[in-house]
Amino acid sequence: MSRWPSPAKLNLFLYITGQRADGYHTLQTLFQFLDYGDTLTIEPRTDGQLRLLTPVAGVPDEENLIVRAARLLMRAASESDRLPAGSGADISVDKRLPMGGGLGGGSSNAATVLVALNHLWGCGLSEEELATLGLQLGADVPVFVRGHAAFAEGVGEILTPVEPEEKWYLVAHPGVSIPTPVIFRDPELPRNTPRRSINTLLNCEFSNDCELIARKRFREVDAALSWLLEYAPSRLTGTGACVFAEFNTESAARQVLDTAPAWLNGFVARGVNLSPLKQALL
């Protein structure tokens, strides 16, 4: 039995630069990981069975990203004669990341399954192959597979490794879940932010094109951001619902968390450029 980290991510900035004919939005964003997240426990099996021991209420196992990722790896490795006979697993997840929070929980779980099972089964797929598989599961999965902070373009799959400052963050959950399509389908969402170079963006004040829509449609997000902004620079991550404030020290972040109103759930974590999953493989 082995335990594998499935870390959260933050979008330190997020700009929507266009919309493709297939409906997907093109963007420019900066991904950084947190030293905080879910934990997957994986017990390899030799009878070919795949079991999720911690099902999610209302989500059939075969639709769960964890199971879908495992099946996808099984199929890809089998088709290239790299799946040892009888490969299977019992998988359980200790969830700390909220669904619909903008922290990448489901995508991170999928990436951890791909990376961990490839290692435990000895399939020998490359990082590039795993990232390509991950993209079939979601646009955010490849960055978790690669495990390095990155500037992302396209629909989020064109990644350039970067080294943003590793600050401390107070991440707050306003108590609502925001499905990504709710934000991306909003007619008022900016969809024509000019594309800029990495260097230009890294030297500008960071912001998120989705933030205004999230604040307008969800008063809880507005209230959380209004409270955080009293203490530090704060933004929405992804399409929400989580918001974060940045600090130079852990103690400063914890001091603010200690004064948080009862309706605001939060945690303090450090931004890291090498993900805990990547570190687990070193």
Swiss-Prot record:
The keyword Kinase applies. The active site is at 9, 140. Pfam families: GHMP_kinases_C, GHMP_kinases_N. InterPro entries: GHMP_kinase_C_dom, GHMP_kinase_C_sf, GHMP_kinase_N_dom, IspE, Ribosomal_Su5_D2-typ_SF, Ribsml_uS5_D2-typ_fold_subgr. Keywords: ATP-binding, Isoprene biosynthesis, Kinase, Nucleotide-binding, Transferase. ATP binds at residues 98-108. Pathway: Isoprenoid biosynthesis; isopentenyl diphosphate biosynthesis via DXP pathway; isopentenyl diphosphate from 1-deoxy-D-xylulose 5-phosphate: step 3/6. Belongs to the GHMP kinase family. IspE subfamily. HAMAP family: IspE (MF_00061). NCBIfam families: ispE. PANTHER family: 4-DIPHOSPHOCYTIDYL-2-C-METHYL-D-ERYTHRITOL KINASE, CHLOROPLASTIC. Homodimer. This is 4-diphosphocytidyl-2-C-methyl-D-erythritol kinase. It comes from Klebsiella pneumoniae (strain 342). The lineage of its organism: Bacteria, Pseudomonadati, Pseudomonadota, Gammaproteobacteria, Enterobacterales. The gene is ispE.
